[in-house]
């Protein structure tokens, strides 16, 4: 029962997290391209200096919503994965390849958590601050253009870090193929000679 419960939590959390990260990673370029092709005009952002940039702002807002939802999924699934990884050594077979793979999975999880934390705490605030500065100073090209450059660079870094998290989670999936139930050995009956 313990093995099944731990594995259920592990696989649900890992697959949900990996799928969510992959969805955001694949959908962000599609959102940007589709909105850019339709060339919208945002009525609340009035500036003659933002010719052609309304689509970037709208697409950025859509992707921001996706990334904020992804953060919630990362926190919940990351917590469940941590609990499952702590419980796994007590319920899985750690002989031969199992022990090494458990260590690799834990290392990949910690690396993915560190990258996601860095993105959340250090990169994402730069994305939002530079976007706000760009919109607030749209009529001042000397301020708006460097803010747009910072926004684009921070957003690219954000997507690259999201891709790194996806790669680390894929590594966890690949190193999970060795997870097995512990073998139960029944003692062999002793033979008595007649």
Language-model regions, residue ranges each:
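Functional transmembrane-helix hotspots
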Residues: 120-136
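Individual transmembrane alpha-helices with interfacial aromatic-anchor signatures
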Residues: 66, 146-166
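Hydrophobic alpha-helical transmembrane segments
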Residues: 10, 97-109
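Hydrophobic alpha-helical membrane-insertion segments
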Residues: 15-22, 108-121
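Alpha-helical transmembrane segments of helical membrane proteins, especially in multi-pass transport
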Residues: 116-123, 159-169
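Interfacial loop at the N-terminal end of multi-pass membrane proteins
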Residues: 2-96, 135-138, 145-148, 184-194
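Alpha-helical transmembrane segments and their membrane-interface junctions
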Residues: 77, 84, 162-179
